[in-house]
């Protein structure tokens, strides 16, 4: 039996080895798989290779996971239609008199699009492509134009149907429908806080916003009304998907399939997108995104199994419990850990890798697992706009290559 000091030393060595591999530039899924195989073989022997294959498969052997590619397909269908543009234009025309109305329009469009796609990158790309050039054209600073979309895009991981919450539900065994319900109000509250900040900033601080409002041509009532028929069908789909989820009519997997089907019907009717080539392009992009996420989930599941098999999970959980008897001290330390993890890893990987460690600690100290899920997700939101990974930052950089990453980060 190893002493406690040598056991702790082994845990730290494994952590350092994992970090070295992940920071080497290897794709996350391949890096986690390599670390898992190396650790299992070195400590347990080559007979663990069979277990490796079984565990990798088990990580994807869940019917609920079917909802992820369906929601991605739903989001990609909307992203490849002019829906984002119509959402943006519609909100802009109705909010034109409000100081910072263009910023608020972007945030509102991000919120609605997030409820359609469940994906932060898709939200950034769809709304940013239209919103950023328009804001720059009307005199807003590059920081405000890019930062608004980068931050607004993070709502995609909190407002249901959120892929991150689906993965959390699968990893922790919590109800996905209840997680969606828990994320709904905080998501729109966060969007409201973004909007209030935009209003205050534009009215009292940002002179560019005042100039943009002064130079703005007033939209006519006809222009305001003509965009509504293009927006209402998508709002109806959001309401329908949420209703069948919360009303107990369908499971998340079934609701995602119905939502994807309705979105395809809607883009065919409203935007005349029904050509096989265009549909295939949407499906192809969705498949690539889905396979990437599924690979990360399977590799993270394998990594979590490896940590548990080598008693790393149990050691870390016990160490965290012994750090302090004050539950709020533990809560703050967990938040710091999640923030740092979110800086370097995608949300899906962080959830699958750490939930087995953190959930027992959280429940031991009496925290509600659903409440903690929202706190967890908000930490992942921060990671999406924080270097060195900061996925949203690089998506915005791709839309505006002439704006430096530091300017986007300041925004």
Feature map (PLM): residue ranges:
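Alpha-helical transmembrane segments of multi-pass membrane proteins
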Residues: 68, 100-114, 138-155, 179, ...
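Generic alpha-helical transmembrane segments of integral inner-membrane proteins
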Residues: 13-23, 34-41, 69, 73-77, ...
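Long, contiguous bundles of hydrophobic transmembrane helices that form the permeation core
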Residues: 36, 171, 178-289, 393-411
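Single conserved hydrophobic/aromatic residue that forms the stacking wall/gate
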Residues: 1-8, 12
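Juxtamembrane helix-boundary/capping and inter-helix hinge elements in multi-pass membrane proteins
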Residues: 82-83, 97, 130, 134-145, ...
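Hydrophobic transmembrane alpha-helices of multi-pass, membrane-embedded glycosylation machinery
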Residues: 17-19, 34-42, 130-131, 259-267, ...
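Hydrophobic alpha-helical transmembrane segments
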Residues: 13-16, 30, 69, 103-108, ...
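Membrane-embedded alpha-helical segments and adjacent helix-loop junctions characteristic
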Residues: 42, 46-133, 280-365
């Amino acid at each position: 039996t190893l002493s406690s000091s040598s056991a702790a030393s082994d845990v730290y060595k494994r952590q350092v080895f994992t970090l070295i591999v992940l920071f080497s530039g290897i794709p996350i899924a391949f890096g986690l798989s390599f670390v898992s195989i190396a650790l299992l073989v070195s400590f347990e022997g080559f007979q663990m290779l069979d277990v490796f294959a079984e565990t990798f498969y088990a990580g994807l052997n869940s019917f609920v996971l079917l909802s992820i590619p369906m929601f991605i397909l739903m989001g990609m269908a909307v992203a490849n239609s002019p829906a984002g543009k119509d959402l943006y234009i519609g909100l802009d025309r109705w909010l034109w008199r409000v100081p910072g109305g263009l910023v608020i329009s972007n945030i509102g469009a991000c919120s609605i699009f997030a409820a359609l796609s469940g994906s932060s990158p898709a939200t950034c790309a769809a709304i940013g492509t239209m919103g950023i050039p328009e804001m720059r054209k009307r005199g807003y600073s590059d920081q405000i134009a890019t930062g608004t979309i980068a931050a607004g895009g993070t709502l995609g991981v909190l407002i249901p149907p959120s892929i991150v919450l689906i993965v959390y539900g699968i990893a922790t065994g919590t109800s996905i429908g209840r997680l969606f319900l828990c994320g709904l109000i905080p998501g729109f509250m966060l969007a409201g806080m973004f909007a209030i900040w935009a209003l205050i900033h534009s009215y009292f601080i940002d002179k560019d916003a005042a100039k943009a409002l002064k130079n703005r041509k007033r939209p006519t009532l006809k222009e305001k009304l003509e965009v509504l028929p293009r927006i209402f069908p998508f709002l109806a789909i959001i309401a329908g998907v949420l209703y069948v989820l919360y009303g107990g009519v369908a499971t998340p997997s079934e609701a995602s399939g119905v939502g994807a089907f309705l979105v395809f019907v809607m883009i065919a009717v409203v935007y005349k997108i029904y050509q096989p080539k265009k549909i295939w392009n949407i499906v192809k992009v969705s498949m690539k995104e889905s396979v990437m996420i599924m690979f990360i989930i399977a590799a993270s599941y394998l990594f979590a199994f490896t940590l548990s098999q080598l008693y790393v999970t149990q050691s870390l959980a016990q160490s965290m419990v012994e750090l302090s008897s004050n539950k709020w001290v533990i809560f703050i330390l967990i938040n710091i850990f999640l923030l740092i993890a979110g800086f370097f890893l995608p949300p899906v990987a962080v959830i699958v890798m750490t939930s087995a460690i953190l959930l027992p600690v959280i429940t031991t100290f009496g925290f509600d697992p659903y409440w903690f899920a929202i706190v967890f997700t908000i930490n992942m939101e921060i990671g999406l706009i924080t270097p060195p990974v900061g996925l949203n930052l690089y998506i915005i950089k791709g839309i505006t290559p002439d704006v430096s990453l530091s300017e986007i980060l300041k925004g």
